[in-house]
């Protein structure tokens, strides 16, 4: 079975790859491809946040009693990223290459820092504290 750190880190890499593909399409002004890649990225990101916020974070908080700790910080960062995603949506809709590329750089840095915190600290803590973690991941893989 796949562990929480393994599965969620792989999802980070998959999101990063799609994000980079969208950015490359915008840089070439291939707006049709950019929209397709961006929509795919946004869907993956939304699903990833949902898996964390609706399932993993509550399970971790219940297991540890920590509700004002790392999961609260991650939720706040998710909100910041959601706001940037909305700004990127607007830049893409306007076919504003410079605005999109500037915002995408900001989002990429934010995602890298965020992912590092999850991968180095939170996911290993989840693996230690969520008793049915592998079963939860198996459910994610099916859906």
Regions found by a protein language model. Name each.
Residues 1-143:
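Small-residue-biased structural context
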């Amino acid at each position: 079975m796949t562990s929480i750190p393994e599965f969620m880190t792989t999802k980070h890499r998959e999101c990063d790859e799609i994000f980079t593909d969208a950015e490359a399409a915008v840089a070439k002004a291939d707006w049709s491809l950019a929209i397709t890649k961006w929509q795919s990225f946004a869907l993956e990101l939304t699903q990833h946040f949902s898996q964390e916020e609706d399932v993993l974070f509550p399970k971790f908080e219940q297991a540890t009693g920590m509700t004002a700790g790392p999961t609260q910080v991650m939720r706040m960062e998710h909100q910041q990223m959601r706001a940037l995603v909305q700004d990127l949506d607007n830049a893409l809709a306007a076919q504003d290459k410079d605005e999109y590329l500037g915002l995408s750089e900001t989002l990429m840095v934010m995602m890298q820092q965020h992912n590092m915190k999850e991968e180095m600290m939170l996911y290993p803590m989840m693996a230690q504290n969520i008793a049915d973690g592998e079963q939860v991941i198996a459910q994610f893989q099916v859906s």
